[in-house]
Amino acid sequence: DFKEVATKYKEEIISLGGSIKYNSKVVDFQNLLDSKKLIFENGDSIAGDIIISVAGLYGDVLAKILKINIEKKQILPFRGEYYLLKPEFQYLVKGLIYPVPNPNLPFLGVHFTRLIDGSVEAGPNAVLSCAREGYNWKTWNFSELYESISYPGFQKFILNYPLITTGELLRSLSKTIFVESL
């Protein structure tokens, strides 16, 4: 239960005198004598000797603001899609069921997971998002999509694995194809 874990972290950070900023875009960074300071888009700032940033899909953007040399690396926003098994078939899955991995891409493969509430999900696939925060086909950001598809690492990947990338795309566009691949 990720929400509960995050809530506990929040409580512990606050109890130790820390503070948390939500939905705050970092625009600048200052290295002070005894601390570090982040400046946010709205003019607010936060300083401390330890700053933990949960930048997620914007980690590479933040690294550039912090002047961290990440060379020619960037985050590619892939999303994973899941489907719930119908209740009458959930009894078939007692725990985790994983496919035999492809040695070239051992992280890839739809699997079955029994959730805490007893339901069973199948997933994820892996498909390039059309925006950094594009969790479905309705969300597009053309500049972010261009940034992803023009990245040489992405181009190399799709050229090296055309069948796999096409299969993942088809599973995303068609529930029938997704289910048949299970």
Regions found by a protein language model. Give the residues of each.
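Flavin-dependent oxidoreductases
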Residues: 29-140
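FAD-binding core/adjacent interface of flavoenzyme oxidoreductases
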Residues: 4, 10-11, 15, 41-43, ...
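Short beta-strand to alpha-helix junction loop
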Residues: 1-12, 21, 167-178
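Exposed beta-strand and adjacent loop surfaces of beta-rich binding modules
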Residues: 23, 35, 166
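Conserved active-site and cofactor/substrate-binding residues in soluble primary-metabolism enzymes
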Residues: 4, 27, 107, 120, ...
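A conserved beta-strand/loop element that lines the FAD pocket in flavoprotein oxidoreductases
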Residues: 14-26
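Flavin-binding catalytic cores
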Residues: 69, 89-90, 115-119, 125-182
